[in-house]
């Protein structure tokens, strides 16, 4: 399927804008899932246990929900691990098992309409994918582009092609 034909098929679908995540780093989304794995938790508790800002906790929790890894109840908001989230936590980060579960969550949840386009080979161009995201989510072009970039950042990990980095490799060396 070409970029343009996939984009046309997505334009016919509507996706709630809350279901199109703003979180681009699957490691931080996984951290939210890990905390939810300790038992139902509130957003303030997630902030405390992850050291993420309120805004970023919201972004990452909505992304985990869109992937089917957590649920969110209302009044009070409680974030609870799903069986898919539990299965994912039993896998190692960056493993084929994790990729399979993340991909399954992506394909079967509210992000499903984007799956065939995002996971296609070759990858869609940012412009074409952003247009599809914008049309499906009724988003402004700038917002659609930002969210499309975030989703495309997940692509290699969902396909099982991402390589994990050890924490030592990610540290800033000052001396």
Please describe what each predicted stretch is.
Residues 2-175:
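Donor-sugar nucleotide-binding helix/loop cap in glycosyltransferases
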């Amino acid at each position: 399927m070409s970029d343009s034909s996939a984009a046309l098929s997505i334009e016919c679908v509507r996706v709630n804008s809350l279901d199109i995540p703003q979180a681009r780093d699957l490691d931080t989304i996984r951290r939210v899932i890990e905390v939810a794995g300790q038992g139902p938790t509130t957003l303030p508790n997630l902030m405390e246990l992850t050291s993420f800002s309120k805004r970023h906790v919201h972004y990452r929790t909505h992304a985990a929900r869109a992937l089917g890894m957590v649920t969110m109840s209302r009044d009070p908001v409680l974030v609870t691990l799903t069986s898919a989230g539990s299965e994912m936590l039993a896998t190692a980060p960056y493993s084929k098992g994790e990729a399979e579960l993340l991909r399954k969550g992506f394909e079967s949840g509210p992000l499903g309409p984007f799956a065939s386009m995002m996971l296609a080979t070759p990858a869609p161009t940012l412009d074409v994918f952003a247009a599809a995201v914008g049309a499906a989510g009724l988003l402004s072009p700038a917002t659609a582009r930002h969210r499309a970039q975030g989703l495309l950042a997940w692509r290699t990990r969902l396909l099982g092609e991402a390589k994990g980095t050890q924490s030592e490799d990610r540290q800033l060396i000052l001396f």
